[in-house]
């Protein structure tokens, strides 16, 4: 599991400026565009009489050259931007202009449709970014940890601690009256950021499925959390890989109630088992809501982010200190002797 409890994919979208859209054309002109005026840019002078002298002809020719004006940048720009208002009545954002004495309308291209697609992409990117940060910065965990350290230290202590899932006797737990099992994901079932069950744990997981049937689920801050797994893609991918239901929830552990979990299993939380590797998240959440809590060792510390490793060290240091001082875990109504459901794996 990747959320530290005591501490904290990809381009941004910006609307395209309209001035950028009105830059001068640099590609060949569209032959379908209508010119802005039926008047010629320059009109040739009336033909001279046959009696004109060569000097007059030369003077007239020079005058024509002076009066002749080639299309300037402004002309090209207007020719490119203007169109007849009767050709496309659906356009908006038209700006009336004047050219050679005739009214014309400046057409600004619409970009709203493209913007919608870009905005959706930007929203998905932002959700993914929040998910990545949320797995490292657990605000709910920080607030809960302060409360635990100050007044609820017994919530950090699990009912039982084991090396991994292979040491749990699922048959005994079923006989004791437990109706379902809730697993954390990262470093409990899988390596961090992995979808595959840790290979040595597969026989134990299959045994748990055989004993509890469909009454097992994953309750994780890295998959199924509505705020960060906005389209359920992470939850669905994990379900397809491990064959275990991933619970959708709105609040990160250790905050929140067990209402969503109880609704899924159809029983009270006191009849459920919470298995996880983090004392200040999985165990605090389980004890606070009445689960039987089982703490496992992390499967792979090497693949954890640096901040998670440091927070984990602090959590375990506090846990060991409080145990040395004689602090006891909260009582559970279905179990009096926790050693009954701990076994030594046969394959070790």
From Swiss-Prot:
GO terms for biological process: chloroplast organization; glycerolipid metabolic process; lipid biosynthetic process; phosphatidylglycerol biosynthetic process; phospholipid dephosphorylation; photosynthesis; root development; thylakoid membrane organization. Its cofactor is Mg(2+). Optimum pH is 8. The keyword Translocase does not apply. Mainly expressed in inflorescences (especially in pollen) and, to a lower extent, in leaves, stems and siliques, as well as, at low levels, in roots. Mostly expressed in hypocotyl, vasculatures, trichomes, guard cells and stigmas. Its main location: plastid. Gene3D superfamilies: HAD superfamily/HAD-like. Disulfide bonds: none annotated. Belongs to the HAD-like hydrolase superfamily. Phosphatidylglycerophosphate (PGP) phosphatase involved in the biosynthesis of phosphatidylglycerol (PG), a phosphoglycerolipid predominantly present in chloroplastic thylakoid membranes and which has important photosynthetic function; seems to use PGP 34:3, PGP 34:2 and PGP 34:1 as substrates. Required for thylakoid membranes development and chloroplast function. Necessary for normal cell growth. Required for root growth and columella cells organization. This is Phosphatidylglycerophosphate phosphatase 1, chloroplastic/mitochondrial.
């Amino acid at each position: 599991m990747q959320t530290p409890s005591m501490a904290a994919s990809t381009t941004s979208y910006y609307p395209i400026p309209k001035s950028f859209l009105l830059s001068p054309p640099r590609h060949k002109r569209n032959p379908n565009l209508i010119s802005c005026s039926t008047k010629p840019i320059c009109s040739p002078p009336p033909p001279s009489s046959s009696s004109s002298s060569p000097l007059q002809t030369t003077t007239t020719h020079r005058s024509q050259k002076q009066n002749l004006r080639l299309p300037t940048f402004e002309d090209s720009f207007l020719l490119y931007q203007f169109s007849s208002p009767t050709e496309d009545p659906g356009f908006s954002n038209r700006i009336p202009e004047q050219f050679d004495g005739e009214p014309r309308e400046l057409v600004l291209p619409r970009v709203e449709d493209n913007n919608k697609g870009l905005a959706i992409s930007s929203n998905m990117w932002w959700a993914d970014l929040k998910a990545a940060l949320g797995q490292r910065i657990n605000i709910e965990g920080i607030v809960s940890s302060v409360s635990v350290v100050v007044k609820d230290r017994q919530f950090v202590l699990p009912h039982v601690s084991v090396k991994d899932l292979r040491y749990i006797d699922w048959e005994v737990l079923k006989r004791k009256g437990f109706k379902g099992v809730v697993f954390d994901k990262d470093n409990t079932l899988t390596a961090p950021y992995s979808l595959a069950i840790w290979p040595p744990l597969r026989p134990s997981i299959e045994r748990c499925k055989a004993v509890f049937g469909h009454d097992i689920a994953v309750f994780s801050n890295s998959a199924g959390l509505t705020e960060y797994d906005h389209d359920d893609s992470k939850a669905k991918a994990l379900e397809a890989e491990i064959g275990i239901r991933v619970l959708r929830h709105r609040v990160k552990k250790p905050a929140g109630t067990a209402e969503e979990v109880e609704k899924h299993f159809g029983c009270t939380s006191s009849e459920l088992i919470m298995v996880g590797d983090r004392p200040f998240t999985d165990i605090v959440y389980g004890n606070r809501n009445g689960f039987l809590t089982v703490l496992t060792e992390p499967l792979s510390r090497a693949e954890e982010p640096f901040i998670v490793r440091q927070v984990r060290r602090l959590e375990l240091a506090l846990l060991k200190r409080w145990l040395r001082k004689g602090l006891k875990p909260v009582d559970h109504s279905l179990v009096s002797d926790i050693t009954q459901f701990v076994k030594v794996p046969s394959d070790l």
